[in-house]
């Protein structure tokens, strides 16, 4: 039913995570995995939580930048210790499928600018720390964490509540 297919909500015309609190008298609609918005949220979760995590597992010294969705998919900008080629994609895809198979829950937490910078400085994620530092925002930085692996990423969200909702995908370009 609708509850089983729900992946996010829209509160006052803003997409939010299912875990977000509702405001009094808010206009609310449910976003399902079968909708265009749900597909975009799945792709966003796939890039921000799965592709980035797989790259960090395989190339621990890679530095993460940003990972948006695009019209027909997603990408993630990162700086690996050595160039990645099209021949590396099957290995990355295999790692992504392992991560998805764990069916990890994804949790969101909010942090001040200083806390968020400290979190990414500790992980030597210079691009993430720079994004936060350059932001006009002072608090409520959203950090998403995979419950099982502890992988974290800075992201605007929303994300799927669990990795087990991710469908089929194929990496095609470097």
Residue ranges of each PLM-predicted region?
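Short amphipathic, charge-patterned alpha-helical segments
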Residues: 1-2
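Auxiliary tRNA-acceptor-end handling modules of aminoacyl-tRNA synthetases
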Residues: 5, 20-42, 54, 63-69, ...
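Short acidic beta-strand-loop surface patches of small beta-rich interaction domains
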Residues: 6-20
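Sparse, context-dependent recognition of short Cys/His-centered cofactor- or disulfide-binding micro-motifs
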Residues: 13, 49, 61, 154-156
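Short amphipathic alpha-helix segments
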Residues: 46-58
């Amino acid at each position: 039913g609708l509850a089983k297919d729900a992946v996010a909500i829209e509160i006052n015309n803003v997409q939010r995570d299912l875990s977000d609190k509702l405001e009094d008298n808010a206009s609310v609609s449910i976003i399902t995995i079968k909708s265009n918005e749900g597909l975009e949220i799945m792709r966003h979760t796939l890039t921000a939580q799965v592709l980035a995590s797989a790259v960090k597992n395989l190339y621990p010294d890679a530095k993460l930048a940003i990972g948006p969705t695009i019209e027909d998919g997603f990408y993630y900008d990162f700086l690996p210790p050595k160039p990645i080629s099209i021949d590396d994609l099957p290995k990355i895809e295999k790692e992504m499928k392992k991560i998805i198979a764990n069916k990890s829950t994804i949790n969101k937490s909010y942090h001040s600018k200083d806390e968020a910078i400290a979190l990414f400085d500790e992980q030597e994620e210079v691009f993430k720390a720079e994004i936060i530092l350059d932001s006009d925002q002072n608090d409520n930085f959203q950090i998403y964490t995979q419950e099982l692996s502890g992988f974290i990423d800075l992201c605007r969200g929303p994300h799927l509540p669990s990795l087990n909702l991710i469908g089929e995908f194929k990496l095609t370009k470097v």
